[in-house]
Amino acid sequence: MIIATLLLTTASTALATASLNDRHSGSEVVSETTRYEDGPMAGGWWTRGKSGSNLISEYKHYTKEGRGSCRNGNATFSDGGWKPAETWSKSKVGYTLLGGNKVYYDYK
């Protein structure tokens, strides 16, 4: 019984680790001096930064599902959702002047 439980626990841990490793992501902190940027990133295209009074993150992967998201200094989070290859995932929140603004991309 103990061996069966140990094997089941080990298998569950391996599956959880594998699913976490299937995700690929990146992030950047956006400050008042950070410019709005866009360019190639991890097999796709990432547009991010401060746009007017908003913090944005838009990501599309060319061959896999992609997602853009952002969080401001008030912990307001916006998730563009998982989108199929070649489709933009767009997120936007209000930019906070006191910092804590961060943008993310992810693909799987």
Residue spans of the language-model regions?
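N-terminal prepro-regions of secreted/extracellular proteins
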Residues: M1-P40
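Mature secreted bioactive peptide module from preproproteins
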Residues: H24-K108
